[in-house]
Amino acid sequence: MYRSHTCGELRVEHAGQEVLLAGWVHRRRDHGPLIFIDLRDRYGLTQVVFDSAAAPTAHAVATDARIEYVLQVRGRVVQRPEEAYNPDLATGMIEVHATEATILNPAKNPPLYINKEGGEDETIRLKYRYLDLRRERMQRNIILRHRIVKFIRDFLDREGFVEIETPILIKSTPEGARDYLVPSRLHPGKFYALPQSPQQLKQLLMVAGFDRYFQIARCFRDEDQRADRQPEFTQLDMEMSFVDQDDVLDIIERLFTALCREITPHKRLLTPFPRLTFAEAMERFGSDKPDLRYGLELVNLGETVATSSFGVLRAALDNGGQVKGLRVPGAGHYSRKQIDEVVDLARQAGAKGLLWAIVPEMGGEVRSSFGKQVSPDEMTAIIRRMEGAPGDLLLIVADTPKIVAQTLDRLRREFGARLNLADPNTLAWAWVLDFPLVEWNDEEQRWDAVHHPFTAPKDEDLHLMDSDPGKVRAKAYDLILNGYEAGGGSIRIHQRDVQQRLFDLLGIDRETAMRQFGHMLEAFEYGAPPHGGIAPGIDRICMILADEVTIREVMAFPKTQQAVDLMTNAPSPVDERQLRELHIALRLD
């Protein structure tokens, strides 16, 4: 036996007992005759005292021990003097007086600090991830993730869901991103794909009669690693039969309300989850995933400036664009240099420029970038419409709806952070509903599915699919948490004729549809029930609940933003023999 107790287990009631501990040397303090070692495992720390007079052999071992050595210690639990209590440790009222000690394995000097945050470059942390994972913060995050997944499994089991594993080697079909392809040795020239999601398989499980399915699913997407993405990720994949949209939203809301109250009881949970339509979210926030922990809502100035003498404003409206503003409370003290930096942010977001005005104190003069282009009455009307108060900074964008939305969304998030408006201890879940079914792809001159090609259109919009597809709303819904998309889902098409109509709209001809999705179309002819589902992202939800800023901090072995595993050096070349077995020849041009 290597240990009788863990390093986080011993308390005052164990005083007088002989115990056996094993762990890593976390800290070592050498006071000559006395050596103090904090012994660590994932459960905590225990202070071990090595006395040269009482146990010279054990003291000699402690003399040789260094940081991160693996150590086994036998000793007696002793209550510390009251003045020596350490309130920061669960074991802080006791210490172990060593009688025997063994170095189970020495350790080289680690390239990063284990016993504190070292601020080293992330590449070092990822290269030596097995050391990084020894840190208290990382172990706390991984254990939090375990608790979240276990809670989900237990909750859904009580709700009558069945966990079913779907294949990892599947057929390659277009789902938005590029597939990771796996060559078949037994079938030369043919390939499997790693699933971007189990979407089609879970729908087929509904046809099979498993009316409540879930899976903690690994998914793979070979896409450019923009922002905080990973080539492989984990989602809670769910599907239900004989449900409408409200049924899906209800069970997810109950799941995550219960989960947050159990896992993060210290956080303020806003319930019930607000429901916004896609159009409302874009109008009020310029985003389909708004952070609802703070206001800073956008203001539509279309009517206010409809007859403006300022050509920039009028031209935007005449060309089908928008004029919207953002009121930033208390930012009127900004210097011209600071305002120029904000203008640069707007340009980075796609705007040609940014209009600004500072609301003066009573009787003062408005400072602005466009005061000479509008009349005093028009400026007053703009300030009144934006509910500007003295000392506020008003920001205005006039452009296409897309540019206006993405620019003001960028500025809203920027000032939400600068003004500390988002309470880190608040969880603001929300639903965004009624997304467009399709969107026009200017580059390829065709309609694309906004979510995926199996999303059902709203019944009342079916008649528009041929005449005005852009106005067709989908039975789709996104789950939002603190400004992040935490998951997406929809009610699915379950009738072959409707599915074929959508394929036709997307430019997928009948032959291609049968080749790529024939298994789905045929299944719909064998009594497919109405069904719908959702797939919340485990990595993202864990990140937010752990108060981290990147999903890499809640994954055991993540890859870099360039999809490289620095620890194992994957991807890596393979030898010619393996390629020949797979009938593959490389062409690197």
UniProtKB/Swiss-Prot annotation:
One of its GO terms (molecular function) is nucleic acid binding. It catalyses: tRNA(Asx) + L-aspartate + ATP = L-aspartyl-tRNA(Asx) + AMP + diphosphate. It is found in: Cytoplasm. Its main location: cytoplasm. Keywords: Aminoacyl-tRNA synthetase, ATP-binding, Cytoplasm, Ligase, Nucleotide-binding, Protein biosynthesis. One of its GO terms (cellular component) is cytoplasm. Its EC number is 6.1.1.23. Residues 199-202 are annotated as: Aspartate. The keyword Zinc-finger does not apply. ATP binds at residues 221-223, 230, 485, 537-540. The keyword Zinc does not apply. SUPFAM superfamilies: Class II aaRS and biotin synthetases, GAD domain-like, Nucleic acid-binding proteins. Aspartyl-tRNA synthetase with relaxed tRNA specificity since it is able to aspartylate not only its cognate tRNA(Asp) but also tRNA(Asn). Reaction proceeds in two steps: L-aspartate is first activated by ATP to form Asp-AMP and then transferred to the acceptor end of tRNA(Asp/Asn). Belongs to the class-II aminoacyl-tRNA synthetase family. Type 1 subfamily. PANTHER family: ASPARTATE--TRNA LIGASE, MITOCHONDRIAL, ASPARTYL/LYSYL-TRNA SYNTHETASE. NCBIfam families: aspS_bact (TIGR00459), PRK00476.1 (NF001750). This is Aspartate--tRNA(Asp/Asn) ligase. It comes from Roseiflexus castenholzii (strain DSM 13941 / HLO8).
